Amino acid sequence: LTGKAGTGKTTFLKRLREHTPKRMVVLAPTGIAAINAGGVTIHSFFQISFAPFVPETTFNSAQIQYRYSQEKRNIIRSMDLLVIDEISMVRADLLDAVDATLRRYRNREKPFGGVQLLMIGDLQQLAPVVRDSEWSLLRNYYETPYFFASRALRETTYMTIELEKVYRQNDTFFLSLLNKIRENKADDEVLNELNQRYQQGFQPPKEEGYIRLTTHNNQAQQVN
């Protein structure tokens, strides 16, 4: 399930949680994303190492011999639906590690152990984090670090649904500017319009709570 910001992906997930009769687990790649989705992190739930996962690992390998409690094993064996939010940030090897774990406790012959998988996110937002040292290993198994290179996912025939209507912004002209920037198609019209809004020397009143965006964490820390 995909769509640009403001199209209702998070709202859909909330409604799904409220109304689905399925036993559902909601995961996300980071702590902040997990809090926003009302779930936990992928690494926490499956107790997966942050080290790269080699997709040719066997089920008996120490790499996937996680010590789960009986309660966790019961949850894994009984879940009907696994939801992964902010899927754009999930690396292909992490998704294959999830697949290996689910196959171990569910059905070894089916991708993700036969569990229904719902991935939610926008590929034009945050990308997966992969260090050069990690990619030097993973590039032997994947064309790209993005989740869609997952070997398990390529064994499935999945459906893609895109939410198109933006509910967060009613100004159609401003929305068209944002979309051009999003698609790397910013032309002179876009740049001129944005530059007209620039106010040199503007000092926001503290009581109005303006948000200041910076390019680096240390700059944000200095401001704060």
Where are these regions (language model features)?
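Conserved ATP-binding/catalytic motifs of P-loop helicase motor domains
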Residues: 1-224
